[in-house]
Each structure stands twice: as C-alpha cells, then as structure tokens.
C-alpha cells in the first residue's frame, strides 16, 4: 500500500476539528509519516498509535496526564535523557493530551528536530481511540468491483455479470420495488473489520444509475431520499449468467462463495432468460440467504427428509437412489 500520502499534515487536517488539535511546533516536519515496513508489520492500528512508549518508536506517541506527571517527577538529567531518546527515535508526531502544558524541553527539542508536536484538551484515551479508528479506516484493504450494489431487505447485495445482461435494468426494477441504491458500475469496497466488507459509491457517481436507452438517472431525485444509501456491508453476490440449460446447475449442493478482500462472500448464480422475473428471483435469493445466516438450510433439510423417507419401510418411496 502507498503510505506516502499518510503524513503528519494529512492526519492533522483530517482530525483537527474532531480532536481539537493545535499544532504547537515542528511545522517543517509535516511530511513525517509511516514507512511501508512499519505499516506492513502492524497487526492492527493499535500498533501505530498509543501511549508514550520508547520500545515502539515508529508510532504516534500520545502523552497524557500520567506521562506528564511521570516526566515532572524525574531529575533534570533523566528528563533530558528521556527527551533526547524520544526525539532521536523519530516518531511521526507527538500529541500532548488532556489539556496539559507541553514540557518546555520537549517543545525545544521538537522545534530543533522538526518533529511535529500537537496539543489537545481531550483525554489521551479519547485521542488514541479516535486515531486508531482513523488509521484502521485509511489503511484498510480496498478494492473496486464492477456491478450494481443495492440494499435489498437490509442486506448489501452486489449484482454482477457480463455487460449487456441487464444489471442496471434489474437494479432499477428493484429500486422501484422499494429497495435502495448504493452504487452503480464501480463500487468501492473496504475491509474495515475481521468479518465484514463495506461498500460505498465513488463521489463522482453518487446517486446515479446508468440504464441503456435512458442514460444517467438521478435515483435520489426520481425516487426520493429513501431510495439511496451511503454504504452497506456486502453479504451476497448475485451473478447473472446466460448459459445453455445443459451447463447450468439447478440445485448446487454446496454453498458458493467469492473471495472479496480475503473474506468469503456468499454467491448465487441466476440464469438470464426470456420470461424470467429476475427481481423476484433476487429477492427470493436474499430471503433464502437471510434464512441461511440464521441456520436454516432448506436444501439440506429436504435431503435429510428424503433420506429418512427412503429408510422408512412403510414409505411410499422405498429403495434407494441409483
């Protein structure tokens, strides 16, 4: 991942209002940030932001009341040694939190070394939590997929398939049935947690749906505010295909999944053919997926019922399948 754009200046600009940050000194070091190795070796955003810790120098160092009190109790010699060691390790920047006054020696050393030094009246714990959430979001794995991303019955569903199969027309039909549009054509996905992938629309395409013959439709203007969504968690991928009957599996015995940013996402395949009501089929697929998430597998229940029927000597289906 390119980390060159993640530096003290960008982090300050994005969080100054939320965290009430003030840039005290070290403005010349605005380009300081994280190396690619530091980001690659970090197991989570907790490795990139934390309380003052000289063992982990390559992270954002936050000094709260406890750290400042500890500093004040040290001898002049120990203070000088600790400050020199901290600055020599070249952290991206330092934050003095809790409204505490930054120690004069720390301010002087940050000025001389061009180390950015921020202050904030907010507590150290609040600053760390907020910066960790921010770092986890901007450093999360990302991907852009082609398709129509919708909110169907509260579930994020991505319609995919070759061009010309009618994905946008199907999306328009589903929107007219009360479902919501997240994005059309290009969908930005980001893995924000260990068990979910979130999809959003690029700002340029916000609220727009392209339909052949009609051009660009502003879904928010046509259908109202409730017809669009800002983001949704991806739970199901519906792939539209056009195949001969002999190549289409009517009853897949195993659940199908697609890997999206390292997370398996449920997938169903729907054949496009004349006379098929695709909107109803997609809604049924979503309802069935919801049941599966609740532990209800209709196909497996049927197979168990069939097996018991064949084992029953009084059953009207004696014998076994061949």
From Swiss-Prot:
EC number: 2.7.11.-, 2.7.4.-
GO molecular function: ATP binding; magnesium ion binding; phosphorelay sensor kinase activity; protein serine/threonine kinase activity; protein serine/threonine/tyrosine kinase activity
Protein known as: HPr kinase/phosphorylase
Superkingdom of the organism of origin: Bacteria
Keywords from the UniProt entry: ATP-binding, Kinase, Magnesium, Metal-binding, Multifunctional enzyme, Nucleotide-binding, Serine/threonine-protein kinase, Transferase
Top enzyme category: transferase
Species for this entry: Burkholderia multivorans (strain ATCC 17616 / 249)
Additional notes on this entry: Both phosphorylation and phosphorolysis are carried out by the same active site and suggest a common mechanism for both reactions.
Residue numbers binding Mg(2+): 168, 210
Binding positions for ATP per the UniProt entry: 161-168
Ranges for region Important for the catalytic mechanism of dephosphorylation: 271-276
Catalytic residues of the enzyme: 146, 167, 185, 250
Keyword field contains Glycoprotein: no
Comment block on domains: The Walker A ATP-binding motif also binds Pi and PPi.
Region spans: Important for the catalytic mechanism of both phosphorylation and dephosphorylation: 209-218
Record family assignment: Belongs to the HPrK/P family.
Known catalytic reactions: [HPr protein]-L-serine + ATP = [HPr protein]-O-phospho-L-serine + ADP + H(+); [HPr protein]-O-phospho-L-serine + phosphate + H(+) = [HPr protein]-L-serine + diphosphate
GO BP annotation list: regulation of carbohydrate metabolic process
Cofactor (UniProt): Mg(2+)
Binding partners and assembly: Homohexamer.
InterPro entries xref list: HPr(Ser)_kin/Pase, Hpr_kin/Pase_C, Hpr_kin/Pase_Hpr_N, P-loop_NTPase, Ser_kin/Pase_Hpr-like_N_sf
Known role: Catalyzes the ATP- as well as the pyrophosphate-dependent phosphorylation of a specific serine residue in HPr, a phosphocarrier protein of the phosphoenolpyruvate-dependent sugar phosphotransferase system (PTS). HprK/P also catalyzes the pyrophosphate-producing, inorganic phosphate-dependent dephosphorylation (phosphorolysis) of seryl-phosphorylated HPr (P-Ser-HPr).
